[in-house]
Amino acid sequence: MALWVVTLSSLVMTSVFAGLQEFREAPTYREVNPGGTVVLPCRVVNKLGECRWEKDGTPVGMYRDKYEWDGDQASGDCSLRVKEANIEYDNGVWQCQVTASDFTQQDTLISEGAELVVRGEP
């Protein structure tokens, strides 16, 4: 019983002092011209999990010269840089996600969907 109380106290103290991860800035509506570059912001306080992105409900991988991290993930910047914007591939609803800080925590983050509009050719 004493071990359980000490363990529970440690978990509570860790959560209070370290804080749970939470969005500082979530992605919002953006527009970009075809062939342009746009940054979808996503900044997280107390980030311990892994940054991920989805477009229209499908996971998006990082690809050099197309989808790249814009900031330092270790410091909580999960922002995504979309290069060479293309209406076929990039137009849609994007979500920033951060996995739980560990398997015992329920602090997974999933942003509201943010629409990225690739403008049509004039």
How should each PLM-predicted stretch be described?
Residues 3-6, 32-41, 48, 73-77, ...:
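Solvent-exposed loop/turn motifs of extracellular immunoglobulin-like beta-sandwich domains
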Residues 21, 45-68:
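N-terminal V-set
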Residues 31-33, 41-43, 68, 81, ...:
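Generic structural detector for well-ordered beta-strands
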Residues 49, 60-61, 70, 88-90, ...:
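Eukaryotic short linear interaction motifs
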Residues 54-59, 67-85:
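Eukaryotic helix-linker segments that join adjacent hydrophobic helices
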